[in-house]
Amino acid sequence: MSIEIANIKKSFGRTQVLNDISLDIPSGQMVALLGPSGSGKTTLLRIIAGLEHQTSGHIRFHGTDVSRLHARDRKVGFVFQHYALFRHMTVFDNIAFGLTVLPRRERPNAAAIKAKVTKLLEMVQLAHLADRYPAQLSGGQKQRVALARALAVEPQILLLDEPFGALDAQVRKELRRWLRQLHEELKFTSVFVTHDQEEATEVADRVVVMSQGNIEQADAPDQVWREPATRFVLEFMGEVNRLQGTIRGGQFHVGAHRWPLGYTPAYQGPVDLFLRPWEVDISRRTSLDSPLPVQVLEASPKGHYTQLVVQPLGWYNEPLTVVMHGDDAPQRGERLFVGLQHARLYNGDERIEPRDEELALAQSA
């Protein structure tokens, strides 16, 4: 079941929370709505579900306009962060509930309901807990029950609002893998809200990054990491170093050093330089690629690489985070050399585009 979100706007009083949002979700795709608090992601999810109504715009399911359709008539499964299980019902009865309240002409008979719930219990690996009550379950088990209950009525679309947000880190990881496997098996269309970047990139086919009621980027997870479409995405997704400098002529100046850009930008003046920790070239010896001296402040081994916090020596005041590969980890106080590879320059929110795809600032002028 495909979803078409067309020119959706939403206001609460004078506050505009969604600004002309358009997004197409193909049938069978799992999409993450990712963003900080206040970005509009949960409001958009609730509009898809029919729990909120847009100020203007349209929602279509497989070409059919459902914009004014009541939530109960959209055939959408919804999973909340805090489970919303019925405390007085067993696990079995919680999962069966949606089937038992269907209109009589659509309601399966008792034997069919039992068979379906039994199958779902096996699918979510909770068959041995069918007679327990929610108070007797762990957080991860409760969320599995909530997912099974949502799937019991065979929804055309599954929507999840921060489904793992209330769980501890290890349980979240296990449930993420399980949800992805379940999606691969059942091939339902799914949209979930999260503020967790790792969760979004691990589970989703496509990540929609939102900020202040706008879509900043909608791409495959690796594309969002490698090719951020805006400054917001660059800063929001993972760790990034920022250096403040100035463009003068065809050179980038930071502190007492300057680097040739290879071209002269139309914009001249203060800029911010961004680069990921793994985009910094680092070496124990000075070279054309890594001419800038730094001193190691912190070294955190991560298995096949070491994450370092280094202090530039004489060319910038703020420390940088970098990644060094190999088994021979540097020690605190050790002197290393870096180059500013794959750098991106921004004047406010506007990227200063180089002639090539990226800048490679290394040897100073």
UniProtKB/Swiss-Prot annotation:
ABC transporter domain location, by residue?
Answer: 3-237
Q: Which reaction does it catalyse?
A: sulfate(out) + ATP + H2O = sulfate(in) + ADP + phosphate + H(+); thiosulfate(out) + ATP + H2O = thiosulfate(in) + ADP + phosphate + H(+)
Main enzyme class: translocase
Q: Where in the cell is it found?
A: Cell inner membrane
The UniProt keyword set, sorted, is:
ATP-binding, Cell inner membrane, Cell membrane, Membrane, Nucleotide-binding, Sulfate transport, Translocase, Transport
Q: Name one GO cellular component term.
A: ATP-binding cassette (ABC) transporter complex
Provide the E.C. number(s) assigned to this enzyme.
7.3.2.3
Positions annotated to bind ATP? 35-42
The answer on whether this UniProt entry bears the keyword Cell inner membrane reads: yes
Q: Does the keyword Nucleotide-binding apply?
A: yes
The cross-references to InterPro entries, in alphabetical order and at most eight, read: AAA+_ATPase, ABC_SmlMolc_Importer, ABC_transporter-like_ATP-bd, ABC_transporter-like_CS, Mo/tungstate-bd_C_term_dom, P-loop_NTPase, Sulph_transpt1
Give the membrane topology: Peripheral membrane protein
**Predominant subcellular localization, coarse grouping:** membrane
Quaternary structure (record):
The complex is composed of two ATP-binding proteins (CysA), two transmembrane proteins (CysT and CysW) and a solute-binding protein (CysP).
| Stated role | Part of the ABC transporter complex CysAWTP involved in sulfate/thiosulfate import. Responsible for energy coupling to the transport system.
Give the similarity note.
Belongs to the ABC transporter superfamily. Sulfate/tungstate importer (TC 3.A.1.6) family.
Q: What is this protein called?
A: Sulfate/thiosulfate import ATP-binding protein CysA
Q: Which organism is it from?
A: Escherichia coli O157:H7
